[in-house]
Amino acid sequence: GVLIYLVSCMGMRWIVIGCHLLYLIVVYLCCKQAGLFRKNQNPPALYWMLVLLPQFAVYANMTVARPQYVSALFVAAFCVILRNAVLNKKYKPMYLLPIITVLWVNIHGGTAMLSYYMVGIVMLISVAGIFVKNIGKISFDKPDGQWIGHIFIVFVLVVAANLINPYGWHMLIYPYENMQDSMMLAYISEWASPDAKNVLTLVLEILPLLLGIFTIVQTDKQINASMLALFFLYIVLFLRSERFLTYLVIVQTCLIAPYAFQIELSPGKS
């Protein structure tokens, strides 16, 4: 509804230009979080050629006047805010997440459930950190009561924010109803799972993902459990439907790519 209204006011040409601007903003946010703009912190050439360039090329090719690419900005914003909250203990920006969620659910309600997925996963990993310290290279930060309180409040607010829309509570179940629509799943190709037998899918989508996973395996650094859990959330979603590829690219670049560059991830240096 919002997109139709904007098209009627501005015309499709300006909406397409706006979506391309959103693409550039999201790429900037991703690359900044990955550390690409840091002095003397350049990614390995192979990572550029085999991961970042193919992924952002596919993302750019998908950039048209669709609400999914507004949602991409929201996913990037959640990555930036949650990463800084977890690694740098910056709590106050987390209270922007419910506000972002209100915009998200009213612009593209079909993906707004990602808001409470992301916050909920960070909350669960934080609780797990009370009982678990490290599992190999996977690091669980031991939370204090203040952090648990903040993340729980933000989670409740984000869930509540999903109710602020013309359809109320029904928007909480709408995405799941979509996923059960057999006709839509059969006739809309982007809802299908990625097909590794397709050469382009293999080279441009699956191979960069596998290299992202290899990044985690090869790094000598401790890997934050929350960042890893968010990455695997989007892997599962992508394997369920190719429509989540754009969001996987964003999450992989923001949260996992820094490990490929051997960038210091300690507090105050993100």
List PLM regions with ranges:
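Specific aromatic-rich, kink-prone transmembrane helix
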Residues: L29, V70-L87, V119-F131
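Membrane-interface alpha helices of multi-pass inner-membrane proteins
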Residues: Q55-Y59, P93-M113, L157-A161, F231-F238
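Short acidic/glycine- and proline-prone juxtamembrane loop motifs at membrane-interface regions
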Residues: M62-V70
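Transmembrane-helix signature of polytopic, membrane-embedded enzymes
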Residues: I25-A57
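Membrane-interface transmembrane helices that cradle and orient dolichyl/undecaprenyl
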Residues: F78-M94, I213-K221
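Short hydrophobic alpha-helices at membrane interfaces in multi-pass membrane enzymes
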Residues: N84-V102, G149-I153, A225-F232
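Transmembrane catalytic cores of multi-pass membrane glycosyltransferases
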Residues: G109-V217
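Short hydrophobic/aromatic helix or loop-helix immediately within or flanking a transmembrane segment
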Residues: G1-G11
